[in-house]
């Protein structure tokens, strides 16, 4: 049932040409398999990713983008290609600026470099 609803959401994302934001718990392998089967044109973004670098690598190889929040794995944050990275405050009471600062430090970026990269990445949502 959940997979059927997910596939319906994928169809909507494709029809309306919108990225798909995905909260995935204990189903990364199946999600990766579905992406291969469906071969979507629109970006798929894993929201609130807390996984290990190996999982991040699997997702990136399969074509996903990854969004990090307050509770991120530092090694994973370093391993995600800059053009596949998003940052969020969904799960946090911290200001987004604090989350940016923590992720920039983990990646060895300045806050300005990270903010500019995320702004470029946001273009998958349309013009900004």
Please place each PLM-identified region on the residue numbering.
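Divalent metal-binding pocket/active-site signature
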Residues: 1-62, 109
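Mid-to-C-terminal alpha-helical segments outside catalytic/metal-binding sites
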Residues: 11-15, 100-128
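Active-site metal-binding loops of divalent metal-dependent hydrolases
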Residues: 24, 48, 64, 70-72, ...
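Histidine/acidic-residue-rich catalytic or RNA/ligand-binding cores of hydrolases
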Residues: 31-33, 56, 77, 95-101
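Short acidic capping loops at alpha-helix termini that bridge into adjacent secondary structure
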Residues: 41-43, 83-84, 112-113
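Short amphipathic alpha-helices and their capping/turn segments at secondary-structure boundaries
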Residues: 74-82
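Short acidic/histidine-rich active-site segments
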Residues: 83-95
